[in-house]
C-alpha cells in the first residue's frame, strides 16, 4: 500500500511539473516571438518603402514591446527566466529581412508577419486550452484579440504587397 501511495504521489508530482513545464515553454516561446516582432517592426519602421507597411512596423514594435513588458512581469512573478535572445529561427528571418530592400522588403516583411502571427495565435490558443497556471492563461487570453487583429491587418497588407510587387 505504501508503494502505491508513493507511485501516486510521484505521478502527481510529474503531472504538476509537466504542467509547469508547458506554461514555462509557452512563456519562453511567446517571449522569443515578441522579441522578434519588436526587432522586425523597428526594421520595417525604418526600411519599408510603403507607408502602410512602415506604420504597421511601428505598431508592431510598440504593441509587442508593451506585451513583452507584461510577459516579463508575469515571468518574474512565476520565477521563470526569459530567454536572452529571440532564437535561431527568428534570427534567420531577421537577417533575411536585413538583406532585402525596396518593395521586396515590404512583401517579405508582411509575409513574415502573417506567418509569425499565425504561429502566435496558435500558441495563445493552445495555452488558453491546456495551460495550467491561471495567470499565464489569462495573459494568453488578454493577448489573443490583439494578435488576431495584427494577423488580420498583416493579411490585408500582404494582399496589397503581392499586387504591388507584380507590376
Q: Would you name each region that the model predicts?
A:
Residues 2-167:
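His/Met- and acidic-residue-enriched segments that coordinate or traffic transition-metal cofactors
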